[in-house]
Design a protein with these regions (language model features):
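Generic long, charged, amphipathic alpha-helical segments
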Residues: 200, 206-237
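Residue-level signal for inorganic ion chemistry
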Residues: 88, 238, 262
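Single conserved hydrophobic/aromatic residue that forms the stacking wall/gate
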Residues: 1-7, 11, 271-281
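Short catalytic-loop micro-motif centered on adjacent basic/acidic residues
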Residues: 74-75, 95-97, 222-225, 245-248
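Short, glycine/polar-rich helix-capping loops at beta-to-alpha or helix-loop-helix junctions
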Residues: 84, 105, 233-234, 253-258
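Long, structured protein-protein interaction/assembly regions in large complexes
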Residues: 5-184, 190-193, 203-207, 212-217
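C-terminal binding/interaction regions
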Residues: 94, 241-245, 250-270
Length: 281
């Protein structure tokens, strides 16, 4: 089961972009067991957070980038109740996808005739489908990345070891960053995103965008990168805004320069290997 089996509770037509965003939001929220909220715009997350309840998770996710969240698609991994529904409609959203909705929540949503509501049912039965893309004269098939890398299996390559709080943030960030368009950089504070830099042609530019989005909340946060840093500049830039720990795959010919930069800034550096971009053809 996947997006194709999700049911719509409204008759408003779904656009091509709507369906892609619903699918992207669903893929991210399925990474988490605890109550989690995801906000997606144009296939990229602009806010993700986990908490003890969905309302707190949603408000934390919104705080990442409220401007970009305007008109976004939201996903949840628990039933949406009335209090959450009231908070959602306080600003414009394009659509919501969740396992279920309380009767009161649906009544609240009915006041927004342009709001698209999708219900998935039990998420435990959902699995990601392979990705199929057309090429000139052929097709490219890639299996979905459903590998869950344990943070305990990662290698600490810096002099300083991570704190428990940093490990929590690094694990959270690693789960989300693989869903950000590459070059992808994500700043996280334990169980919420703080800044996201997506889709840039150079990794340092993605770091700068994440920095811009996170100020003034970046101090004491951690950074996740979907691929290795080809130069030390990404670490140097992150250190300027208070990043304390970094997770990345490693594998650059300049890995030692990157490690040296982390040590100079007293940043904890973890290598995962493989990259979340690795896949099977």
């Amino acid at each position: 089961r996947g997006m194709s089996s999700a049911a719509s509770d409204v008759y408003k037509r779904q656009s091509y972009n709507n369906l892609l965003d619903f699918d992207a939001a669903l893929a991210i929220v399925m990474e988490f067991d605890e109550p989690t909220a995801v906000i997606v715009k144009h296939n990229n997350p602009c806010g993700v957070a986990s908490s003890t309840n969905l309302l707190d998770a949603f408000n934390s996710a919104m705080s990442t980038d409220p401007q970009s969240a305007f008109g976004g698609i939201i996903s949840f991994n628990r039933e949406v109740d009335a209090s959450l529904a009231e908070e959602i409609i306080s600003s414009f959203k394009e659509g919501i996808i969740a396992p279920s909705y309380s009767k009161e929540a649906l009544e609240i949503f009915s006041s927004k005739e342009n709001l698209r509501i999708m219900g998935t049912g039990n998420l435990e039965s959902y699995h990601r489908s392979p990705s199929l893309r057309s090429l000139d004269g052929g097709w490219l098939l890639q299996e979905a990345d459903e590998v869950c890398i344990s943070i305990s299996d990662c290698k600490v390559v810096s002099k300083r070891k991570p704190t428990n709080e940093e490990l929590e943030g690094l694990e959270f960030g690693w789960k989300v960053v693989k869903h950000v368009k590459s070059n992808a950089i994500l700043f996280a504070d334990r169980k919420r995103t703080v800044g996201i830099g997506a889709g840039q042609m150079s990794r340092i530019d993605s770091v700068k965008i994440a920095t811009f989005k996170s100020i003034p909340d970046s101090k004491g946060t951690v950074m996740a990168s979907d691929a290795f840093f080809p130069f030390r500049d990404g670490i140097d830039e992150a250190a300027k805004v208070g990043i304390t720990a970094v997770i990345q795959p490693g594998g650059s010919v300049r890995d030692q320069e990157v490690i040296d930069a982390a040590n100079e800034h007293n940043i904890c550096l973890l290598y995962t290997s493989p990259s979340p971009r690795d896949g099977l053809l």
